[in-house]
């Protein structure tokens, strides 16, 4: 259950960060309404809160380092699904390596 909870929290944090950043980008770079920026800022605050719900046994550094692997995968998925820019083979290999690294950071016996 701890692994499932960690994965769900990482995915929620990643979606909040990516969607928040994307909305701010749309506001500032694509001349969208200021409400895109406001909603983006709210999502980015949510992103900052979600990692604090991870298990107490993990330090800040470990949580954020492992989150980086999940962020890489979610960023590539967002680019593919939202921006219609599919990842190439080296990007997919790199994302898999990042996930392996994230798992080692969190779950390697200490």
Curated annotation (Swiss-Prot):
Domain of life, source organism: Bacteria
Sorted UniProt keywords: Cell membrane, Membrane, Transmembrane, Transmembrane helix
Membrane topology per record: Multi-pass membrane protein
Signal peptide segment: none
One CC-aspect GO term: plasma membrane
TM region(s), chain numbering: 7-27, 33-53, 63-83, 89-109
Main location: membrane
Pfam families: UPF0060
SUPFAM superfamilies in the cross-refs: Multidrug resistance efflux transporter EmrE (SSF103481)
Disulfide cross-links: none
Similarity comment: family membership: Belongs to the UPF0060 family.
NCBIfam families in UniProt: PRK02237.1
PANTHER family: UPF0060 MEMBRANE PROTEIN YNFA
HAMAP family (UniProt xref): UPF0060
Protein name per its UniProtKB record: UPF0060 membrane protein Haur_1798
């Amino acid at each position: 259950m701890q692994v499932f909870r960690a994965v769900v929290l990482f995915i929620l944090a990643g979606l909040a960060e990516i969607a928040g950043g994307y909305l701010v980008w749309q506001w500032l770079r694509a001349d969208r309404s200021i409400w895109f920026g406001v909603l983006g800022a709210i999502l980015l605050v949510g992103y900052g809160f979600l990692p604090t719900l991870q298990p107490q046994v993990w330090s800040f550094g470990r949580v954020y380092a492992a989150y980086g692997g999940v962020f890489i995968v979610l960023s590539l998925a967002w680019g593919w699904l939202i921006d219609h820019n599919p990842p190439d083979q080296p990007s997919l290999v790199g994302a898999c390596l990042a996930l392996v690294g994230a798992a080692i950071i969190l779950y390697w016996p200490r």
